[in-house]
Amino acid sequence: MQNDLLTYNARSPLEDHAIVLRRRLTATLLAASLTLGACSTPVMVRETGERGDYRPVEKYVSWLIERDMAENQITGYSIALIDDQQVIWQKGFGYADLENKIPATPETVYRAGSIAKVFTSAATMQLAERGKIDIDQPLVKALPEFSIKTRFPEAGPVTPRNVMMHHSGLPSNYMGNLFVRNPPPFDMVVAGIKNEYLSTPPDFVFSYSNLGMSLLGATVEKNSGLGFADYMEQNFFTPLGMTQTRFASPALTKAYDQNKETEVFTLRDMPAAGLLSNVVDLSQFVKMQFAEGRSGTQQVLSPATTHEMVRVQNAKLPLTFDAYMGLGWLLNGVEVPGGGPVASHGGSLPDSHSMMAILPEHKLGVVILSNSATSAVSVTRVAAEALSLMLEAKTGIHPAPKATVRTDERAPSAEELRFFNGHFDTLVGLVNVSSKSGSIDAEAVGHHFQLVTHEDGLLSLKYKILGLVPVRVGLFEDIRLSTATINGRQIIVGKIGGESMVFGEKLRPAPIPENFLKLVGSYEIIGKIDGPSPDKIILKEEGGVLVGEVRFPEKPELLLRIAFQPVSDHEAVTAGLGSGRGDTLRLIKEDGEDRLAFSGLILRKKLN
């Protein structure tokens, strides 16, 4: 079913807090119940030195990292701070190998995860510079083998540009053999998706796609005559002096969860998340970006390309709000007040997290790599704090204090009570909302919340202890929700800090075809998955909505839910907007029985 439901993978809403605002909101919601009543470490006073003196930055960031590591049981952590062409500080904390007491250093190699997408996009742009690819032409021109079905014949094509900005309409993932011990070659997706559908019209909404990056990787191979890993080695890693960096599958690195070693699984989509590197090497890439594509005597990318990759690409699209995208780089999710645009990309795998973030206008950057499942929130927070402090040290621009504007609570209006009643697809999956009691109560991923209306028309969140008593939680204080109708769709807009984005959508009940109603029940995946897989998959009807529920043995307390909207007698799509939405569930006949097909997986109804 939906991507988070069928693989306990890089997009787990429990921990994936690093890449964009949507996952920051998700992690906040899910972390809140764990932080109620928790004691906090005393805050260290931020010191200010002379202009150009980064020693106070090093001191404060070291304290922040050590605090996060202690509070979240993070095993290994490395960081580098870059000012234009100079690495001003780099350090490792904790252990690369806990059992053998091998310390983490700046040279420690980690799984950099989705930072890979910046490199894959850079390779695509490099081939465009060389006249091999036109990023504004249909992808099929550069990759003739590419083929996928569509329900949007009037929409524009999938292009390399909209793939790089995650607006291609492609599914987020192709699930078959996605996250396993020994994955097949990533380019198997080219043939695999021929019977799949686009999830949305291209250039419609942000929908993060690992699949899209694998298609770009195949495009690089097709138009360069080299294997993807070889192309990256010859055209980026060697010219940049990144001697410890490579694209590899599987990854031979240690990983931990709460200081306990965990088995490392590999995302099949190497161009999307298969980068191995250290902070020393990644600093070289950042320096190249600041030097307009130059490294030493070599021009790796043109100045025009480096500027285009950090230029907002989706400003005019109605569902963008503040979720701005460059090419490969995300231009949202890391906030540095006064610093101008922040370009970043994080990497989030179940066992490790990373962040590479830059202030292009000031040529300041930070790279963070960690080998721990529990570092998801930390890598983003530390990156933002480090950039803010570096900005102050370099320019004298002081971090603007967060403006906390609180308006009085009020009773919800009749219109609000009407709107907030029913099923909503959100960043944390399917949410049931009820306003029958006169308040707006929501249930999501096994937790209970209350939506509180305010005089300014916005809504805030309270967590309901034991599902009964609504209380304010610090993690929710800067989250505000509002509603909007765009292209006929009833949208919930989420705002955290200074950034807004699509948080969810109200679902409209539609008749469920008899073919689907006959198939409600428990399911199993046919064929062994050599990696994490769900032990409970249920298809059910709930209040006129077709609902999928999944649990994983690794996280038995977490119930993941997604709604399906029928589009024909034999096809339904995951409901809502954004990543993992719009993907097709098909009824098929195989070996004389009715089965479900979803994104390369075949599901069979259990007999008992």
What are these regions (language model features)?
Residues N9-T28:
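Bacterial N-terminal signal peptides that target proteins for export
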Residues A27-G37:
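Bacterial N-terminal signal peptides
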Residues G37-A38, L127:
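Hydrophobic membrane-targeting alpha-helices
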Residues G156, G212, N278-D281:
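An acidic site on a long C-lobe helix of protein kinase domains
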Residues C39-K91, E221, L226-E233, T238, ...:
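Catalytic loop of the DD-peptidase/beta-lactamase superfamily, centered on the K-T-G motif
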